[in-house]
C-alpha cells in the first residue's frame, strides 16, 4: 500500500513539474471590473505620441489607442469607461505592461522577437526606418557621411542596434554616443557636441515639426534599418489582443486610417509610403 502511494505521489510530482506555466491574463475582465482602461503613452515621441501644447496626450498611436478603448467599451457593453493616460519613458514602456501599470502602450515601439519574450504586440500599426538628423550646414545628408563623426542615439533602442549593425556591415567608422532620451540628443546636436542624431525617421520628422526653426536641420535621405511598430499588450491575453486587432482592422478596412494619418502627419505634408499603404491593405482583415 505504502509503495503504491509513494509511486502515485512521485507520478503526480512529475506531472506537476512538467505542466507549462501559462500565465493567462484577463485584461478585459480587469477593465470590466474597474470600468477603467489605462493607456500607456510616450510624451516625447512626436508625431506618434506626445503631449500637445495644452498638455493633452496626442499623436498617431494615441489616437489609435483611443479608438481601441471605444471598441473595448462596446465589447464589454459598458455604459461608461474611464480612459486613464499613463506616461511612460523609453526604459519604462515594456515593464509598464508587464507589471500591470498600463493595459496597452501607445508609442513608437518596434516589434522585435526579443521583446516578445516579455510582451505581445497588436497587429502592425506603422512602418518606418532608422535615419539621421544633422544640422543644415553639416554636409551630412546620408548615413555614409557620418564616417569619422559622432552620432547620438538613445540607449537601448532598436535604432541603436540597427545603427551599430549598419556601421559594422558597411565598414563605416563612426563614434556612437549613447544618450538617455531624444531631448538630450537634440540638445547635443544643437550644441554641436555630436554631428548627427539617429532615430526612427518618423520620429525625426516629428521633432522637425515641433522645432522652432526646422530649416536649421537636415534629414538624412536614406535608411539604415526598417522598423515595424505595434501597440504593446500583455502576453497570453488573446481576448484583449483580439479586440485591439479587430478595432485596427476596422480602422484600416473602412478608411478611417486616412483621417488618423492626416490628423497626425498632414501638417508636414506627408503621405503614406507605398510600404505603409500596403500594410494598411494587408491589415484590413475581414470579420
Segments from the language model and where they lie:
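Extracytoplasmic small-molecule ligand-binding "clamshell" domains
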Residues: 25-105
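Ligand-binding clefts/hinges and TM-proximal coupling segments of bilobed small-molecule sensing domains
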Residues: 32, 158-177, 215-217, 249-287
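Bilobed "Venus flytrap"/periplasmic-binding protein-like clamshell domains
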Residues: 38-47, 57-74, 110, 128-182, ...
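Beta->alpha turn/N-cap motifs
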Residues: 41-45, 86-91, 100-112, 136, ...
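Periplasmic-binding protein-like
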Residues: 43-44, 126-137, 201, 208-248, ...
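Extended ligand-binding regions for polar small-molecule ligands
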Residues: 59-71, 144, 149-150, 155-157, ...
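Acidic, polar ligand-binding/catalytic clefts
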Residues: 66, 77-145, 282-286
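A ligand-binding cleft/hinge motif common to bilobed small-molecule-binding domains
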Residues: 91-92, 106-117, 161-169, 190-191, ...
Amino acid at each position: 500500500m505504502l509503495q503504491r502511494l509513494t509511486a502515485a505521489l512521485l507520478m503526480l510530482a512529475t506531472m506537476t513539474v512538467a505542466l507549462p506555466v501559462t500565465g493567462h491574463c484577463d485584461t478585459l475582465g480587469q477593465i470590466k471590473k474597474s470600468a477603467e482602461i489605462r493607456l500607456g503613452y510616450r510624451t516625447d515621441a512626436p508625431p506618434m505620441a506626445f503631449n500637445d501644447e495644452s498638455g493633452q496626450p496626442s499623436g498617431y498611436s494615441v489616437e489609435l489607442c483611443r479608438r481601441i478603448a471605444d471598441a473595448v467599451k462596446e465589447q464589454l457593453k459598458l455604459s461608461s469607461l474611464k480612459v486613464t493616460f499613463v506616461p511612460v519613458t523609453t526604459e519604462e514602456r515594456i515593464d509598464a505592461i508587464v507589471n500591470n501599470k498600463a493595459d496597452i502602450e501607445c508609442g513608437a515601439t518596434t516589434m522585435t522577437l526579443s521583446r516578445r519574450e516579455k510582451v505581445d504586440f497588436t497587429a502592425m500599426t506603422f512602418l518606418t526606418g532608422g535615419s539621421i538628423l544633422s544640422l543644415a550646414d553639416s554636409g551630412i545628408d546620408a548615413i555614409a557621411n557620418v564616417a569619422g563623426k559622432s552620432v547620438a542615439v538613445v540607449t537601448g533602442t532598436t535604432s541603436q542596434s540597427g545603427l551599430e549593425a549598419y556601421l559594422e556591415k558597411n565598414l563605416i567608422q563612426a563614434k556612437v554616443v549613447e544618450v538617455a532620451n531624444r531631448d538630450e540628443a537634440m540638445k547635443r546636436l544643437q550644441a554641436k557636441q555630436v554631428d548627427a542624431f539617429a532615430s526612427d525617421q518618423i520620429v525625426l520628422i516629428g521633432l522637425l515639426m515641433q522645432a522652432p526653426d526646422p530649416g536649421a536641420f537636415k534629414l538624412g535621405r536614406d535608411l539604415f534599418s526598417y522598423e515595424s511598430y505595434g501597440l504593446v499588450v500583455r502576453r497570453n491575453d488573446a481576448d484583449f489582443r483580439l479586440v485591439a486587432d479587430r478595432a485596427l482592422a476596422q480602422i484600416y478596412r473602412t478608411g478611417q486610417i486616412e483621417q488618423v494619418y492626416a490628423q497626425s502627419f498632414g501638417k508636414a505634408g506627408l503621405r503614406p509610403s507605398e510600404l505603409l499603404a500596403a500594410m494598411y491593405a494587408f491589415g484590413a482583415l475581414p470579420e
